[in-house]
């Protein structure tokens, strides 16, 4: 079974590119990372930074998560991210996404030992 940390990496990490390569980025990535296999995941964010830099956020600014839990952390610096949002015309199994590139602070929930990101909460 996929661990929470591994799932975070599959769903949110793309260190191989510094930003979204094209407007088709989300359509390709959401499919290749298995987020359209049983339904279209409505919203997802990819982070274009090194895994080490994203894992380091777990020791940065402690903030409250959207759900009220206290194990969320906000990055000190902005990071290159790509937001993928399902379009109005998207219909499973032909999931369609709008690709939006941004530089924002990320907020992740961290758990475990080692203490690593397991959930992408928000970007600000």
From Swiss-Prot:
InterPro entries: RNaseA, RNaseA-like_dom_sf, RNaseA_AS, RNaseA_domain
Superkingdom to which the source organism belongs: Eukaryota
Name this polypeptide is given: Ribonuclease pancreatic
Annotated active site: 12, 119
Catalytic activity: an [RNA] containing cytidine + H2O = an [RNA]-3'-cytidine-3'-phosphate + a 5'-hydroxy-ribonucleotide-3'-[RNA]; an [RNA] containing uridine + H2O = an [RNA]-3'-uridine-3'-phosphate + a 5'-hydroxy-ribonucleotide-3'-[RNA]
Gene that encodes the chain: RNASE1
Binding site for substrate: 7, 10, 41-45, 66, 85
SUPFAM superfamilies attached to this UniProt entry: RNase A-like
EC number(s) from the headed UniProt entry: 4.6.1.18
Provenance organism: Bubalus bubalis
Disulfide bonds: 26-84, 40-95, 58-110, 65-72
Cellular component terms (Gene Ontology): extracellular region
GO term, biological process aspect, one: defense response to Gram-positive bacterium
Cited function: Endonuclease that catalyzes the cleavage of RNA on the 3' side of pyrimidine nucleotides. Acts on single-stranded and double-stranded RNA.
Subunit relationships: Monomer. Interacts with and forms tight 1:1 complexes with RNH1. Dimerization of two such complexes may occur. Interaction with RNH1 inhibits this protein.
Region (Disordered): 1-24
Family under the similarity heading: Belongs to the pancreatic ribonuclease family.
Glycosylation sites: 34
UniProt keywords, alphabetically: Disulfide bond, Endonuclease, Glycoprotein, Hydrolase, Lyase, Nuclease, Secreted
Note: The sequence of the river breed (Italy) is shown, the other type is known as swamp-type (Indonesia).
Annotated localization: Secreted
Outcome of swapping residue 61 to K: In strain: swamp breed
PTM notes: Swamp breed ribonuclease do not bind carbohydrate, but there is evidence of a polymorphic form that does.
Listed GO MF terms: lyase activity; nucleic acid binding; ribonuclease A activity
């Amino acid at each position: 079974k996929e661990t929470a940390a591994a799932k975070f990496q599959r769903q949110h990490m793309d260190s191989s590119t510094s930003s979204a390569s094209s407007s088709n980025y989300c359509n390709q990535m959401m499919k290749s990372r298995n987020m359209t296999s049983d339904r279209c995941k409505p919203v997802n964010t990819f982070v274009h930074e090194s895994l080490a830099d994203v894992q380091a956020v777990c020791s940065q600014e402690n903030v409250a998560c959207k759900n009220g839990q206290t194990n969320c952390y906000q990055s000190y610096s902005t990071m290159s991210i790509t937001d993928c949002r399902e379009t109005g015309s998207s219909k499973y199994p032909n999931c369609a996404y709008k690709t939006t590139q941004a530089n924002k602070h990320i907020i992740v929930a961290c758990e475990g030992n080692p203490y690593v990101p397991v959930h992408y909460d928000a970007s600000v």
